[in-house]
Amino acid sequence: WEITLKDQSKHRFKSLILTCPFPQLKKLAKDYLDKKITNLKIRMEPNITVMVAFNNQKNIPISSIKFNDDVLAWAANENSKKRFKSNINLWTLQATLKWSKKTINKYKVDNSIMNKLILRFIKLTGFKKNKIIFKRIHGWKYSYNYKKTPFLSVWNKRYNLGCCGDWFNGPKLEDAWLSANDLAKKIG
């Protein structure tokens, strides 16, 4: 395999492992994959997530909150993780699937999308609107696949090409690990 980077430098590899979402995998590797893979009917769903840090708010003794809301699906309290020792409150906010679908192509240019998620979080929790010292939004156009495929991963020995990712098995992080582990076993 020969990979050309943005700076036009070329690098050669004996094997290639792709961990990209299905629509991108299909474009990159369709000539090297079996039709039973490229003909899969995979529907990838979008996701919009905001990271926000509030200054000096009381420590909140919960790890996450699930909302019954049209915009905000859940919030994770990053301070509840033992690896963090912080005097600021760190939160990860995740939009609903419906709202993510509606805003995925606009979030990079429309700051109101990030601000709406943050204000919704404040309204739904009743937390004080303390000074926000950090906020960042990111969206994944191809974030989730809720339907399992017949495969956990793919290894094409002829081309030394491997493919793995959470979308093979489901929407969770553990599905990505299961897929990668399965591919590692196939490679040997």
Regions found by a protein language model. Name each.
Residues 17-19, 52, 93, 135, ...:
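Generic structural signal for small/hydrophobic residues in well-ordered secondary structure
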Residues 81-86, 134-163, 167-169:
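FAD-binding beta-loop-beta segment adjacent to the flavin cofactor pocket
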Residues 156-188:
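Conserved mid-domain beta->alpha element of the FAD-binding
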Residues 22-25, 57, 80-82, 96-100, ...:
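Short, solvent-exposed loop/turn segments at secondary-structure junctions
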Residues 10-63, 127:
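Central helical "cap/lid" subdomain
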Residues 85-91, 95-141:
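Flavin-binding catalytic cores
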Residues 60-93, 101-103:
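Anionic-ligand binding region
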Residues 1-11:
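Conserved beta-strand-loop-beta-strand element in the redox core of flavoprotein oxidoreductases
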